[in-house]
Design a protein with these regions (language model features):
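Conserved catalytic cores and adjacent C-terminal regulatory segments
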Residues: 1-507
Length: 507
């Protein structure tokens, strides 16, 4: 099953999200970046720019933090020294009236051009990272105030016409219609948006910046007006990108900070805050569309208890009011708070590790003495799994694999991977009375920590249907094989197709 990385918007508070991800990255203790563990990366506003910088720019989190600080200093210049606050606010107000933006929108565009180049398209050969990771960047259409998503993929049910029916679909019966939002894909290839244009559009928050006009589209503005936390929107897209995958194996949602007013302060709020206009503004700002944390709570309320275990939220709680989106002076404080605040790093670490492993049947189930015997193999998303196995072994020396009802077995031993190329393949056997009964395989780190592998728990029937989608039963051996010279299972990987990436698309 696919995994999702979602990054909230929040202006300068984006530094908090970067630092929180960096803390998880350090806990993973692997040489590749955090985002490579995920199949679908989505972002809104500054979260969208960060997603582009990581997945398209292929920068590390350390590099992205440094680049972020440079962008902020260029886009949000400090007020003149000695200028009274009231006068600075008055200047900003008149700038907004005169040019429809407080800050220079041309400067923002130039910063994005310098960051992402002037020629790279989001949907192009060079824009598609070899890993095959899908990207979704949120925006809001100005005229209708509806959600739009920039993508580097098509999906089966690409978009809807004004009549509400899909304009391009390959399977009319099985495509899940997109309702209330569309993918921003132009009718002709020449009008494909450039990466810097997508970055410029997703952060065009009123009144700070003007909307962005793109060829072949209506003007668009900040995606945070409709989905400041794009986690749920990513779930909407799952069935269009990966038909047959109704739920993700893991969702890591990264916030940029929030503030909950304590009850005792609510009881003593001024009479002015209880009047009509402040109530309207407060309700608007706290709505799930704009408030990332409230959006997350609403999403969890729609999930059952078992599904919630796959949803992880990283966020920072402020004791006082949230810093303004353009308050660059708060960045040092934001960074320090994000480095010291509590987040469940162990939950993120162990869940991400487990999501990197998935199961494939090596043959159809066989009925024997009232039980279906199912032979299969545990594989890894990464071609070379040695560094990942080393990190798991270092943190949890006694880790094992919990296989269905059979109990615990060894996991990641020297006989389960190639010592020359690192290809991981651990064969296991599952037993079940019915093909429709969910079975489970999990990484058992210690007596208190156990995480499901990708696609578990699930029925054997689900695996059979997935591997038979093309009409014939396909196994991992039909996609790749290891051809290293045999020296106690030391083998080299030989891909049967040159299009297969180093990070596998099988999950």
């Amino acid at each position: 099953m696919p995994s999702i990385l979602s990054i909230d918007g929040g202006g300068v508070r984006g530094i908090a999200g970067l630092v929180l991800m960096k803390r998880v990255q350090e806990a993973l203790d692997v040489p590749w970046p955090l985002w490579r563990f995920f199949d679908f990366v989505v972002g809104t506003s500054v979260g969208g720019v960060i997603a582009l910088d990581l997945a398209i720019g292929q920068h590390s989190l350390e590099q992205s933090i440094a680049r972020f600080l440079g962008w902020v200093s260029d886009i949000f210049p400090a007020p003149p020294s000695g200028m009274p606050v009231w006068r600075h606010k008055l200047r900003q107000f008149w700038a907004w009236v005169a040019r429809d933006s407080i800050y220079d929108s041309e400067r923002l565009e130039n910063v994005m051009k310098e960051a992402f180049g002037k020629t790279q398209h989001l949907f192009s050969v060079e824009g598609q990272h070899w890993s095959g990771i899908k990207l979704g960047i949120m925006a809001t259409e100005v005229s209708r105030s509806e959600l739009r998503i920039f993508t580097n993929y098509n999906g089966i049910g690409r978009c809807e016409s004004d009549s509400g029916k899909p304009t391009d679909m390959t399977d009319w019966q099985n495509v899940k219609f997109r309702t209330g939002y569309k993918l921003l894909r132009p009718p002709v290839v020449d009008e494909e948006p450039l990466v810097f244009e997508v970055a410029r559009a997703t952060v065009a928050a009123p009144p700070y910046f003007r909307p962005k006009q793109l060829r072949g589209h209506e003007p668009v503005q900040d995606g945070g007006l409709r989905a400041n936390n794009p986690s749920e929107q990513a779930l909407w897209e799952l069935s269009a990108i990966w038909p047959g995958h109704a739920r993700p194996s893991l969702v890591l949602s990264v916030g940029t900070g929030y503030h909950d007013t304590p009850p005792h302060k609510l009881a003593t709020q001024s009479a002015w805050r209880s009047r009509g206009m402040p109530r309207i503004v407060r309700s608007f700002m706290m709505s799930p569309c704009l408030h990332g944390q409230n959006s997350w709570k609403a999403l969890l309320n729609r999930l059952d208890h078992s599904a919630r275990k796959s949803f992880i939220r990283l966020n920072l709680e402020f004791e006082d009011e949230e810093p303004a989106l353009d308050n660059a002076a708060e960045i040092p404080s934001l960074r320090a708070r994000a480095e010291s605040c509590y987040i469940d790093v162990v939950l993120s670490q162990t869940s991400i590790w487990a999501s990197a492993f998935f199961f494939e049947l090596t043959g159809r189930p066989q009925l024997f003495c009232g039980y279906y015997i199912c032979h299969g193999v545990i594989l890894c998303k990464f071609e070379d799994a040695r560094q990942l196995l080393r990190a798991i072994r270092k943190a949890y020396p006694l880790h094992q694999l919990a296989v269905g009802t059979q109990g615990l077995v060894e996991f990641g031993t020297a006989g389960d991977y190639c010592g020359e190329c690192g290809l991981f393949q651990q064969r296991i056997r599952l037993e079940t009375k019915t093909l429709l009964t969910p079975v489970d395989v999990a990484l058992h780190y210690d007596t208190h920590t156990r995480r499901h592998l990708s696609s578990f728990p699930n029925s054997i029937e689900w695996f059979v249907a997935r591997q038979s989608a093309s009409g014939e039963f396909r196994t991992w051996e039909s996609v790749m094989r290891c051809a290293c010279k045999r020296t106690s299972r030391k083998r080299r990987v030989t891909w049967t197709s040159s299009s297969i990436p180093k990070r596998r698309r099988c999950y």
